[in-house]
Curated annotation (Swiss-Prot):
It comes from Arabidopsis thaliana (Mouse-ear cress). This is LOB domain-containing protein 27. It comes from the Eukaryota. GO terms for cellular component: nucleus. It holds the Pfam family LOB. Belongs to the LOB domain-containing protein family. PROSITE patterns: LOB (PS50891). Residues 35-136 form the LOB domain. GO terms for biological process: microsporogenesis; pollen development; regulation of asymmetric cell division.
Amino acid sequence: MSNTKHIHKGLQERLLDLLLIALIVYMTLKGGTSGACAACKYQRRRCAADCPLAPYFPAEQPKLFQNVHRLFGVRSIVKILEKLDETQKPEAMKSIIFQSYVRDRSPVHGCLGVTQQLQYMIWFAEEELKAVNSQLQLYRSQPQNGQNQNQNHNHNQMIHELGSDHNKQQEDVTSQQLDLGMGLNVNNNQSNVVTPFFSSLLPVSETQQPQMSYTYSCSEVNNNGYSPPAYNTDSGKEILTNNNNVWGDQNRFLYNNNNGGGYSNQNESCHEMKSNGVMAIQSQLVNLQMVSNHQRVEEEEADHEYDELHQFLDIIDDRQSFGDSKEA
């Protein structure tokens, strides 16, 4: 009888053990299938169906909730979510989780370190963009600068060629004038001034005295030749329009376009031009002869002084040599 009671008691204990194991397994399976959030597991409480933190803290990521709980706390997170709409809650929780994650990795700087790093990257990209734009501007301006330099060089070369051609033609004209018995424009009161090629384009002031010169047209200069301009009615228009300032009288021989073209007092103007030209040539010839005579006299005086000095030096040397020989 006692043995039967002992066996029955052992069976009851085993049955209780089996029931306890089954209950533990059941509770484990029930908790796993229900998907309790990491917040509820961390707080060791039952996860309700309307848990506000369940969508953002899954059960398999307990470290995520620990970081948020350490930085903000459960009550602070719940208060933040209660003030937001349903559409804003995911974005707010994303920022909270990110801040707690960065603070866990960088306890000193936190999100400020990430922000400064991003700002440095933006600044570096902007500086690189500025450098690229400056290089592009430099490369784009190089052909333009080269073209401007070539244009300036061509312009200076053209001016130099025009000046050399003008000087050469002026020398040819001077030689031809001397051959023809004409003189240059010499003024005793002023220095010898050569009339520039574009003098007809420059205005003559009222105080400046007009200088009479034997001029020639631009077309004749371009043809590298010279021929005295004919003072007739056909070429008078070109002479008056191109060399109006040379004769010093701008309002006297103006071309009249009011009545369909033509000249006013053509015969009188041509006659006056001829007389003025003859008088200018005669005065120039006289001045040239006077200058040449003056230069010749100066050269003769200089040669005479040099000869006298040379003779004086010879006499001095002879006397010195004669004295030395006498003493010896």
